[in-house]
Amino acid sequence: MSKVLVVIDIQNDITKHYKDIVDGINKAIDWAKESGMYIVYIKHNNTTAGTRTFKPETKGAELVPELNVVSNNIFVKTKSNALTSEAFAAFISENHINEFYVCGADATACVKSTCFNMTKAGYSVHVISDCVTSYDLKKVDEMLAYYESKGCEVKVLAEYTA
């Protein structure tokens, strides 16, 4: 059984609220590294015509400079569900990963879709609740309850690192 920390969409075009969780995400990265987990970074590329954010090859699509990038496991998706990235799906299969620790943004979109689809696929999913944010902070608690209702374990980072 292999485990992975999945950091979702902590890019320059994401909500400014990422600044509230990036230190926690970096601590989660340190913990995952010390625990021998794989660490992956998911980036969203928006290929829809007429949109301005998350455009491929722009500063907005880059990972934020405050994020501690400790591996070359950076996968790009064009849909909200990270499992739709063929390269990420292949990485999961090749490394026999079946347990996921998830953090990042947006709680109401890409994190939600990814967690839902991971549990639907039968994976064990742990959401690091104090390392998840949203454009709409009022929705975060509702989303954490949703993740639990779909079979995810939801805990703060300190509970995982204890």
Question: What are these language model-derived features?
Answer:
Residues 7-8:
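Short hydrophobic beta-strand that contains or immediately precedes a catalytic carboxylate
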Residues 18-22:
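Flexible, glycine- and charge-enriched loops at secondary-structure boundaries
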Residues 32-48:
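Von Willebrand factor
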Residues 16, 49-50:
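Glycine/Thr-rich phosphate-binding loops of Rossmann-like dinucleotide-binding domains
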Residues 11-17:
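Short acidic, Gly/Ser-rich segments with clustered Asp/Glu that frequently serve as metal-coordination loops
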Residues 2-4, 13, 23, 27, ...:
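Active-site-adjacent betaalpha module
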